[in-house]
């Protein structure tokens, strides 16, 4: 049987992929041209020619050997070097090594901080000085002084209100609420009249922090900070027993709604235990 004769056009068409001619490459001097064929958005066959400039440079031997590694996967049949169909050449980043002398020169050119410039920050007025040297310390800008002034005003108001009524006041309510029998050995119902409950405390609250919070308001006889049994962290509330009832009232007026450790405190009278 004689083999079937085919025309040269059929043989060329059979070599095409999806009816597109193969990619052609040719070099002229230091320029490399790559001609590719593809379909555009309108479905028409177009020819794309890319031009590459050939540059010769000296590289380390390990880099040259790495470029001749055998390729794998979809690029196993590609020639050495990057292939435009599977590889996108990004911008080269060159590493520059700086000597210690150049580094010292660069640091000398940088603007340095003035010798007399202070880097301290005041927590009262946010000035460039230490808080202990703040000129506004002890004024209305100082939060501690503000709490002390509020406590004094609240105590004075409580005394003036009691004197204006002219009514009989029990001995245990005079002089701040627990002048008689207000100590630790007093009856529970007497002590609870000067006890306040502070809630919405953070987990990191300690007895020292609690004492620091209330010691400016007035003397107290007992502090209780509720803690978790397993972790030892604060449960979020505490009880403070003041020596005088007027100090307890001042604590409610001053600390209720006061911001402490990024939380808003809630202070109220302690309810009597059944």
Curated annotation (Swiss-Prot):
Biological role: RNA-binding component of the eukaryotic translation initiation factor 3 (eIF-3) complex, which is involved in protein synthesis of a specialized repertoire of mRNAs and, together with other initiation factors, stimulates binding of mRNA and methionyl-tRNAi to the 40S ribosome. The eIF-3 complex specifically targets and initiates translation of a subset of mRNAs involved in cell proliferation. This subunit can bind 18S rRNA.
GO molecular function list: RNA binding; translation initiation factor activity
UniProtKB keywords: Cytoplasm, Initiation factor, Protein biosynthesis, RNA-binding
SUPFAM superfamilies hit by this protein: RNA-binding domain, RBD
Coiled-coil residues: none
Subcellular location: Cytoplasm
Lineage top rank: taxon: Eukaryota
One Pfam family, short name: RRM_1
Residues in RRM domain copies: 194-272
Database matches in PANTHER family: EUKARYOTIC TRANSLATION INITIATION FACTOR 3 SUBUNIT G
A GO CC annotation given for this chain: eukaryotic 48S preinitiation complex
Gene Ontology annotations of biological process type: formation of cytoplasmic translation initiation complex
Assembly description: Component of the eukaryotic translation initiation factor 3 (eIF-3) complex. The eIF-3 complex interacts with pix.
InterPro entries hit by this protein: eIF3_g (IPR017334), eIF3g_N (IPR024675), eIF3G_RRM (IPR034240), Nucleotide-bd_a/b_plait_sf (IPR012677), RBD_domain_sf (IPR035979), RRM_dom (IPR000504)
Similarity comment: Belongs to the eIF-3 subunit G family.
Name this protein carries in UniProt: Eukaryotic translation initiation factor 3 subunit G-2
PROSITE patterns: RRM
């Amino acid at each position: 049987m004689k083999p079937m004769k085919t025309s040269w056009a059929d043989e060329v068409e059979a070599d095409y992929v999806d009816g597109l001619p193969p990619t052609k490459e040719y070099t002229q001097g230091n320029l490399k041209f790559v001609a590719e064929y593809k379909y555009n958005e309108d479905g028409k066959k177009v020819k794309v020619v890319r031009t590459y400039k050939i540059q010769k440079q000296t590289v380390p031997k390990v880099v040259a050997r790495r470029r001749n590694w055998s390729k794998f996967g979809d690029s196993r049949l590609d020639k050495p070097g990057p292939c435009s169909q599977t590889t996108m050449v990004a911008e080269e980043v060159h590493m520059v090594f700086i000597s210690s002398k150049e580094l010292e020169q660069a640091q000398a050119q940088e603007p340095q901080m003035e010798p007399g410039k202070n880097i301290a920050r005041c927590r009262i007025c946010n000035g460039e000085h230490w808080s202990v040297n703040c000129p506004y310390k002890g004024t209305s800008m100082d939060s501690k002084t503000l709490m002390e002034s509020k406590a004094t005003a609240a105590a004075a108001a409580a005394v003036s209100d009691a004197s204006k009524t002219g009514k009989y006041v029990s001995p245990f309510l005079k002089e701040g609420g627990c002048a008689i029998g207000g100590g630790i050995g007093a009856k529970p119902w007497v002590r609870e009249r000067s006890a306040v409950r502070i809630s919405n405390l953070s987990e990191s609250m300690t007895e020292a922090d609690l004492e620091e919070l209330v010691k400016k308001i007035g003397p107290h006889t007992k502090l209780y900070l509720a803690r978790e049994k397993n972790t030892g962290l604060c449960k979020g509330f505490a009880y403070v027993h003041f020596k005088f009832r007027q100090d307890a009232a001042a604590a409610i007026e001053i600390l209720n709604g006061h911001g402490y450790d990024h939380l808003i405190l809630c202070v109220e009278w302690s309810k009597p235990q059944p």
